[in-house]
């Protein structure tokens, strides 16, 4: 996984990603910013949509003072942004955050709890939730079932089985692997 994510260089060959591929990696060592709530971290998965909404609001403000020619262009720009927001389920952000929070047991902790007060396992759940909400083209998961109880593992199985993009995962949980993957590559370190 370290070679795939670029943290280590391979002894031979290279790893290349297509230009427009977004890969998301669950790094269990990522620091979470003190003062942010679980809800804020999960919602940050949609920052690009929130930025788009700000851009749309800026266009609406300009419309109040625009002449006829400018108004036409502003309306087209606003329409394009509105279509993008709708296509990316912008108006469902809160319900998606709630769903993932509930599914990973974060709602039981309280979505408004400061992430600096969480245990290591709880922080990992927050990072997993954010990553799942980001829906990258390729999801890279390193031991995703660590810190998850049976019901949360079952939810993750369903999520991955329905995931429309590719994912690569490392796990020692054989029943979990057998239920979510269609290709297994077993790497064994052999010392010479």
What are these language model-derived features?
Residues 1-192:
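ABC ATP-binding cassette signature C-motif
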